[in-house]
Curated annotation (Swiss-Prot):
Family: Belongs to the DisA family.
Name of the molecule in the record: DNA integrity scanning protein DisA
Enzyme type, top EC level: transferase
PROSITE patterns xref list: DAC (PS51794)
Entry keywords, A to Z: ATP-binding, DNA damage, DNA repair, DNA-binding, Magnesium, Nucleotide-binding, Nucleotidyltransferase, Transferase
Enzyme Commission code: 2.7.7.85
Provenance organism: Kineococcus radiotolerans (strain ATCC BAA-149 / DSM 14245 / SRS30216)
UniProt record, GO biological process: DNA repair
Task of the protein: Participates in a DNA-damage check-point. DisA forms globular foci that rapidly scan along the chromosomes searching for lesions.
Extent of the signal sequence: none
DAC domain boundaries: 7-146
Amino acid sequence: MPDRTPDEVLRQTLAILAPGTDLRDGLERILRGRTGALIVLGFDRVVDSLSTGGFALDVEFSATRLRELAKMDGAIVLDRDVSRIVRAAVQLVPDSSIETSESGTRHRTAERVAKQTGFPVISVSQSMRIVAVYTGNRRYVLEGSDAILGRANQALQTLERYRARLDEVTGTLSALEIEDLVTVRDVCSVVQRIEMVSRIADEISGYVVELGVDGRLLSLQLDELVGGVGPDRELVVRDYLEASRYEGPLEAVLESLAGLHQSDLVDLSQVARVLGFSVGGDSLDSAVSPKGFRLLNRVPRLPGAIVERLVDQFGDLQKLLAASIDDLMTVDGVGEQRARAVREGLSRLAESSILERYV
């Protein structure tokens, strides 16, 4: 499966196998029937070259057909969309030189076929009554909804605490930006918290995929808790990227933040290093000024193109806050009505941010 990372392939495969899908129903039937199965999720020339015996079917997929075909020896080959059963009772002969950590014949074959073809392969163990999914070099054992929900709810509680702390440090940053008292430490604290929220949210979204129809409520709770976090992540970095004198593109900074090890993420000096700020001594307490992207994006009905022009024209937030309606009208695309909306919007944000901090 080209152009997809191993994590993406695994997540998409788990979505196909989630509760409520026909394939999951078929696997549950196989487990209840106390039989095993070897199922390849895709068919091409490579899979064909590894296949001997069996018979071609090319019939519509259904859970009951999968269950009946699993009673026979040999593998079942489905198409990539899991909409048709291509072959059944097939003996798969992958390259025996491919390394495998499995001991059972069915699992060894599944792992080797997954590595050689690039398609996900499912192995249902008759003796252990487990379903293992192989994607490339990855092996994943399917769990029941109750076990996944238990972990997901625990992660959701952690996310709620992280989000509350993020809102707190973000509110503090807004007030400090208005007063022009921001330090590198304040910026890094917000970026750190956004990244922590993003990571726990990614973990929960994986649970949502695995849960399928059982994860609808969890999905709604997740959407509510992470609303606005993605845009804020980019806007905060854009606000201070020039101040840090970082010479690379914005996307490179965001990728570096995402790639930080968990132990480095809790160290603000490591976050500062990724953002391009100098590290050492009292550098975290150095004063910095934002460009104004984040606060301007909180002004209602202000197009992104106008935000870009305002920042280009005035350079930083303090000059934007000091600008009169006439000054704002000098920006291309900003008439009197929009200038007044920007002026009043920034004034309200300034007032509310300071009130939230000191009251």
